[in-house]
């Protein structure tokens, strides 16, 4: 009986020992990778053309990281598909920390716009650190007979479906900003999509359409010349760059909040030690006075975070924008 018992147990013990050894080797291999990282060039993918906020943030980070880590760090612009093409390239890259993504709120909006999406935003990308935040500014033609948001809502309710707001295109952040205003303020302002912010702003300034939401730098430039009037910002608190402009939440739309964030991602499954190192390097890079000045010039504010904090922000926005997109029946399929 004892002999038979040994025959049954022995293979099981051997199998268990083998599994434990394999697990140990895998852990050792991963830890070793993290210890020698980085040992070669790091690539930061930007899913938009050069010159925009994500691109400039990536270049600031690349410059500072290169000096700190002693390895080359380059920016790789891969525009197209509203940011999906570049993000997908990082989602499908090796999980070694050498291919990163400087992403934005567009990453949380895009999955809700398509019935089939090339990657899983929760599993295939690892949030490393938020970098900066901003918001949109509600602009109206200066000839519109309103002095604040309360007046605008009153006017829109008296003319349901007759007024128009412009956007940079279907599914853009200013499109969703406007859709949220329609919902929360109980108004019906029609959407006119353009191919970019500039032509939409031109038509607001010319009085062809009544209003739109625009990024802070664009809003400031047009308002300074008197071409548009700024009524409110979409962020939960007033912006340091525009302290005199109230938030929508304090302007008769109490539940309104739409913040734009920018942040660094690694491929899903990247070792946590590498992710933590990258988060520390990101914080170090944007703690430099010169980098902070560049953020201000871009019309954004520093918003550095831990990987866990950034993951929560991204997941919350994935859920929120899915609800908004569903409520307005928007699809880009």
Each language-model region and where it sits:
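N-terminal (or domain-start) structured segment
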Residues: 33-123, 162-164, 170, 186-213, ...
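A ligand-binding cleft/hinge motif common to bilobed small-molecule-binding domains
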Residues: 107-116, 182-184, 211-245
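An extracytoplasmic/periplasmic, membrane-proximal ligand-sensing/linker region
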Residues: 39-41, 224, 272-333
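Beta->alpha turn/N-cap motifs
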Residues: 102-107, 167, 197, 214-219, ...
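Bacterial N-terminal signal peptides that target proteins for export
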Residues: 2-20
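N-terminal signal peptide c-region/cleavage motif recognized by signal peptidases
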Residues: 29-31
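Hinge/capping helix and adjacent helix->loop/strand transition within the periplasmic-binding protein
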Residues: 92-97, 112-199, 248-250, 261-294
């Amino acid at each position: 009986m004892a002999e038979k018992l040994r025959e049954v147990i022995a293979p099981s013990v051997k199998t268990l020992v083998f599994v434990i050894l394999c697990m140990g080797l895998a852990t050792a291999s991963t830890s070793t990778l993290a210890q020698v990282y980085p040992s070669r060039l790091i690539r930061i993918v930007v899913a938009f053309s050069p010159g925009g906020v994500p691109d400039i943030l990536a270049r600031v980070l690349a410059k500072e990281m290169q000096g700190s880590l002693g390895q080359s760090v380059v920016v790789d612009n891969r525009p197209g598909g509203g940011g999906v093409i570049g993000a997908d390239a990082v989602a499908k890259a090796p999980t070694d920390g050498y291919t990163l993504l400087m992403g934005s709120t567009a990453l949380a909006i895009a999955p809700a716009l398509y019935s089939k999406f090339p990657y899983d935003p929760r599993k295939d990308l690892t949030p490393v650190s938020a970098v900066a935040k901003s918001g949109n500014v509600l602009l109206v033609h200066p000839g519109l007979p309103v002095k604040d948001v309360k007046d605008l809502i009153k006017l829109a309710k008296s003319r349901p479906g007759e007024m128009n707001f412009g956007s940079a295109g279907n599914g853009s952040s200013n499109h969703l900003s406007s859709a949220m205003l329609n919902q929360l303020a109980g108004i019906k302002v029609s959407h006119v999509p353009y191919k970019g912010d500039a032509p939409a702003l031109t038509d607001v300034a010319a009085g062809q359409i009544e209003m739109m939401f625009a990024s802070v730098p664009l809003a400031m430039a047009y308002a300074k010349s008197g071409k548009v009037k700024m009524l409110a910002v979409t962020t939960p608190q007033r912006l340091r760059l525009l302290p005199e402009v109230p938030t929508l939440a304090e302007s008769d739309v109490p539940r309104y909040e739409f913040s734009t964030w920018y942040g660094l991602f690694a491929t899903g499954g990247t070792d946590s030690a590498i992710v933590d190192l990258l988060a520390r390097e990101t914080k170090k890079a944007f703690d430099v006075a010169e980098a902070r000045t560049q953020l201000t010039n871009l019309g954004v504010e520093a918003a550095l975070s831990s990987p866990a904090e950034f993951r929560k922000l991204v997941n919350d926005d994935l859920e929120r924008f899915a609800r908004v997109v569903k409520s307005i029946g928007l699809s880009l399929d």
